[in-house]
Amino acid sequence: MAWTPLLLSLLAHCTGSATSYELTQPHSVSVATAQMARITCGGNNIGSKAVHWYQQKPGQDPVLVIYSDSNRPSGIPERFSGSNPGNTATLTISRIEAGDEADYYCQVWDSSSDH
């Protein structure tokens, strides 16, 4: 079996807060097909906020893959899962496929803000 590395680019984005909120993600993750990728998104007390994850392939609009920390929209494979237990939210993609190569964005929604 050939080892095919996939580059999962990562970008962080924060919305819904009137104050500045900083998110941190690694710049990229390289994973072999059929392996598992864990993509993290860190922020102060991020566990108290709703985290959403988007996948964007070149030339395409972003696709929501996880919403409200761990919920999967209809049509998203079970290989995609999310968790948000504290100061780090995680998107996990099991059994990586070539089609998973994309940019992944974490987005935080602070429901305590009306902005």
From Swiss-Prot:
Residue segments, region Framework-2: 51-67
Record region (Complementarity-determining-1): 42-50
InterPro entries reported in the protein's UniProt record: Ig-like_dom (IPR007110), Ig-like_dom_sf (IPR036179), Ig-like_fold (IPR013783), Ig_sub (IPR003599), Ig_V-set (IPR013106), IgV_Light_Chain (IPR050150)
Protein's GO biological process: adaptive immune response; immune response
Record's keyword terms, sorted: Adaptive immunity, Cell membrane, Disulfide bond, Immunity, Immunoglobulin, Immunoglobulin domain, Membrane, Secreted, Signal
GO cellular component terms, semicolon-separated: extracellular region; immunoglobulin complex; plasma membrane
Main localization, broad class: secreted
Chain segments carrying region Framework-1: 20-41
Subunit structure: Immunoglobulins are composed of two identical heavy chains and two identical light chains; disulfide-linked.
Function statement: V region of the variable domain of immunoglobulin light chains that participates in the antigen recognition. Immunoglobulins, also known as antibodies, are membrane-bound or secreted glycoproteins produced by B lymphocytes. In the recognition phase of humoral immunity, the membrane-bound immunoglobulins serve as receptors which, upon binding of a specific antigen, trigger the clonal expansion and differentiation of B lymphocytes into immunoglobulins-secreting plasma cells.
Protein name stated in the entry: Immunoglobulin lambda variable 3-12
